[in-house]
């Protein structure tokens, strides 16, 4: 494949999505070695170049057609799209799919002593954030005026430092807020990681490679959400047992050697098999119940 047909994928150089993005691509069979001193890693087995950049640069690189694919948080994507629409710059991309990592929420938070009733409690106050566009959109929808304090990091210290009355920042567990004397009041945006593609027309070879990668990503994500279940079941309660298997479709039922009253069931479940379900299966006579993770799925 020529240099122009090499697929370029942008991922976060460091931070909460970096390792998961690399893990996903490797699970898709893309072999590469990352040198922390270099921004580009070349795949050993596919015509793919991996660009390791700042997360807030990824949407623009995809929208401008500099790279073909990007793995990015939906919050960063949405923030950049609003910014570019304001500046009349290219803001279109194709969201191929949401991924199963990078979950977070963008929330308003205030000091513990603040008497908060609803978002209107922030009327006229100063709010520190790294996401001014998402905050502005939310507050405009609520009809609330405020003053913003733009910070690139350490947003949670702004109230104690006297820079702001409240904040709008990413929250995962809330532990950082609590450590800084803040509490969460409103969720304004929920986000996961996603894969985006440039809207520029691709060559047939490059689009085929993109389709192959997306198919593999779908298989990896689906496998994570599924379990392989094996058990022995009495034939008299077979229908009840199959009905209990969460998300199972068309389980394989096999006869057991020298036992006409019991069968073996193999099934792929798209949901977790919890202890109460396993106990219910046991009460129906099921035995030798095994629940195993699945590494990859296709078809």
Curated annotation (Swiss-Prot):
Annotated protein name in UniProt: ATP phosphoribosyltransferase
PANTHER family in the record: ATP PHOSPHORIBOSYLTRANSFERASE (PTHR21403:SF8), ATP PHOSPHORIBOSYLTRANSFERASE ATP-PRTASE (PTHR21403)
GO biological process, one term: L-histidine biosynthetic process
UniProt lineage: Bacteria, Pseudomonadati, Pseudomonadota, Gammaproteobacteria, Alteromonadales
UniProt family annotation: Belongs to the ATP phosphoribosyltransferase family. Long subfamily.
Molecular function terms, GO-annotated: ATP binding; ATP phosphoribosyltransferase activity; magnesium ion binding
Cellular component, GO annotation: cytoplasm
Co-factor requirement: Mg(2+)
Organism: Shewanella loihica (strain ATCC BAA-1088 / PV-4)
Catalytic activity field: 1-(5-phospho-beta-D-ribosyl)-ATP + diphosphate = 5-phospho-alpha-D-ribose 1-diphosphate + ATP
EC number(s) recorded for this UniProt protein: 2.4.2.17
Leader peptide range in chain numbering: none
Keyword DNA-binding: no
Pathway given in the UniProt record: Amino-acid biosynthesis; L-histidine biosynthesis; L-histidine from 5-phospho-alpha-D-ribose 1-diphosphate: step 1/9
Regulation: Feedback inhibited by histidine.
HAMAP family referenced in this protein's UniProt entry, alphabetically: HisG_Long (MF_00079)
Known role: Catalyzes the condensation of ATP and 5-phosphoribose 1-diphosphate to form N'-(5'-phosphoribosyl)-ATP (PR-ATP). Has a crucial role in the pathway because the rate of histidine biosynthesis seems to be controlled primarily by regulation of HisG enzymatic activity.
InterPro entries: ATP-PRT_HisG_long (IPR020621), ATP_PRibTrfase_cat (IPR013820), ATP_PRibTrfase_CS (IPR018198), ATP_PRibTrfase_HisG (IPR001348), HisG_C (IPR013115), N-reg_PII-like_a/b (IPR011322), N-reg_PII/ATP_PRibTrfase_C (IPR015867)
